[in-house]
Swiss-Prot record:
Protein name: Peptide chain release factor 1
Gene giving rise to this polypeptide: prfA
Keywords linked to the UniProt accession: Cytoplasm, Methylation, Protein biosynthesis
Function: Peptide chain release factor 1 directs the termination of translation in response to the peptide chain termination codons UAG and UAA.
A GO CC term attached to the entry: cytoplasm
Matching Pfam families: PCRF, RF-1
Transmembrane regions listed in the UniProt entry: none
Length: 357
């Protein structure tokens, strides 16, 4: 472990020099890749440096206690310092083990969040809207930027489908466990008999793809320009600003009319399409891999039911880790930290168990 840490420190110092090299700075793709690598190593190096200071404290305290000639007060102080340093050493060793776990290369990325109303008709579409609000409020609490990309709104205010770009530090690392089927149990607003119905919405979390990672060949792309049907203000009937893009090999389609200009809609459409197409091919590769190589939280199957939101009991249950919280109102208002932290800890624990086998 310590040889690995020394190697990491050496690489971190090398990256610092490279990132100040004018030749590297002028190469945007390489500069961004090296910046990400440096950011990924930063916590490891800082924790290891702290660990070395603790080892030094332990060594100094033991040496002074072994020399003798100390009064009782000094001995007591050194013993307390030694005990505290040893406890800190154990904690730092566990922290280092977690930091050295194989890291998902997408953890530092922004995400495209896609929510669809599934089983349950209008009620499922309304629940999709509830989930969208939950993620938006959570994003705001994290200081992330939340931007609607594409929305198919139902007549009663729900969403058949909605996509959002969430940008900020560590977005994917915190929200990657949200992909799957979310089930709601409640009395719908349209229910006159007061019966509880069960509906489902599906959530898909995709790491945002940057231009240097993937560019769709123009011959594989069909672009249609048309008049926006609502968003766009006064120019909806004057200028065709809405954009529809279809990736011909996969049939993946995106439509964008949220912005007031065709160019802005085109830019957002290609960003969303790039991410969806990249995710499509990546998922094919993941499906070929052994289950052990998928995330240890759940099966990795995007149709897997991951969570139930029970309104009559004010209960949220995450089925993958057996977590039940009587805090439905709080969670749907965006206070998701307890759920997300539990998923992260569970995933890390399982990975450590695999590592120690």
């Amino acid at each position: 472990m310590f040889d690995q840490l020394e190697s990491i420190v050496g690489r971190y110092e090398e990256l610092g020099e490279l990132l100040s090299d004018p030749e590297v700075v002028s190469d945007t793709k390489r500069f961004m890749e090296l910046s990400r690598e440096e950011a990924d190593l930063r916590d490891k190096v800082a924790t290891y440096n702290e660990y070395k200071k603790v080892l030094e404290t332990i060594s100094d305290s033991e040496e002074m206690l072994g020399e003798g000639g100390l009064d009782d007060d000094m001995k007591e102080m050194l013993k307390e310092e030694l005990s505290s340093a040893k406890s800190q050493k154990e904690l730092l060793e566990e922290e280092i083990k977690i930091l050295l776990l194989p890291k998902d290369p997408n953890d530092g990325k922004n995400i495209i969040l896609e929510i669809r109303g599934a089983a349950g008709g209008d009620e499922a579409a309304l629940f999709a809207g509830d989930l969208l609000n939950m993620y938006q409020h959570f994003s705001e609490s994290q200081g992330w930027k939340f931007e609607i990309m594409e929305a198919n709104i139902t007549g009663i205010g729900g969403y058949k489908e909605v996509s959002a770009l969430i940008s900020g530090p560590s977005v994917y690392s915190k929200l990657k466990y949200e992909s799957g089927a979310h089930r709601v149990q409640r009395v719908p607003v349209t229910e006159t008999q007061g019966r509880v119905h069960t509906s489902t919405a599906t959530v898909l979390v995709m790491p945002e793809v940057e231009e240097f990672e993937m560019t769709i060949d123009q011959k594989d792309l069909r672009v249609d320009i048309y008049h926006a049907s609502g968003a766009g203000g006064q120019n909806v009937n004057k200028v065709a600003t809405a954009v529809r893009m279809v990736h011909l090999p996969t049939g993946i389609k995106v439509e964008m009319q949220e912005e007031r200009t065709q160019q802005k809609n085109r830019d957002k459409a290609i960003k969303l399409l790039n991410t969806k197409v990249f995710d499509y091919y990546q998922q094919i590769e993941l499906d070929k891999q052994n289950a052990e190589r998928k995330s240890t939280v759940g099966t990795g199957d995007r149709s897997e039911r991951i969570r139930t939101y029970n309104f009559p009991q004010n209960r949220v249950t995450d089925h993958r880790i057996g977590l039940t919280l009587q805090k439905l109102d709080s969670i749907l208002s965006g206070k998701m930290d307890e759920v997300i932290d539990a998923l992260i800890v569970y995933d890390q624990t399982k990975k450590l168990e695999e590592l120690n086998k």
